[in-house]
């Protein structure tokens, strides 16, 4: 797509915008009436288990985009996507704050969301029905990928008074591992076990969203909290301006152990000065953030949304240095939606 002449792209966009104007009431399968009241039983897309991509589905007045907590990166970046999509197409977009990856996959699977932000590892688990209780033996066969975006960095935030210098030092500590059932919790438990030798009985597990985890650290209610998001994470920035906080600098051995246990982890580094009071670079690991959708969501709409985002990257300010056409399939862990594939081919 990137090599297509500008005039051809403009003509194509005109056609897509026309399709949007003509088809805005039929853009989503299993979408209900757009008010969230009974979104799981609208249309005739069913559960999508035996269908291909791009069904015409039911009716909706808005693209329902599920993001994450307001203190993370998913929510503000989704707000920027909303602005670009509404500016470049005739589709209205509604961005919702959610518990992020695991919840978002469930919303896509039952038709309550049309697009969602998720982690690439959670996408793999959900599509293949493994490793997570929410999906074990019950794969979300309608889950489809749109694009990967940027590294989702694992932040292990520490109370400076806790005297923690390694993951194994968290034995017996109060540790917030993220929202119950979230991708953050999954990553935290994986890392604590593989790199720290700790299972859930070895520490006092707490479960809240990013913002509440920051509050717990500020109030001294936990010794450590896991936050997963592209740096700088808003909740961490805010915490660092009001509270002394440290971020665990993972050793080479800890990072290697995490990578050996889970292939979706990659080495990552939080640059010095990213957060107030953190004067040195912090070594850690990361996963990938991605946009996902449903197999029964209209291919023309997915293509139009994908094109709107990737042809207007200059309008993004959050994570724009990582998001691009050339890297949009790096770490893609599930099958692409037909509409996204048409754009990137």
Regions of interest found by a model, annotated:
Residues 158, 289-296:
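Short, well-ordered beta-strand elements within core beta-sheets of diverse protein domains
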Residues 1-134, 140, 150-153, 160-169, ...:
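Terminal disorder- and signal-encoded targeting elements
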Residues 215-228:
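Charge-rich, low-complexity N-terminal segments
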Residues 209-215, 328-336:
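Short, conserved secondary-structure transition motifs
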Residues 178-198, 207, 214:
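Loop-centered beta-sheet repeat module
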Residues 117-118, 208, 226-228:
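Short beta-strand and adjacent tight-turn residues that come in two discontinuous sequence segments
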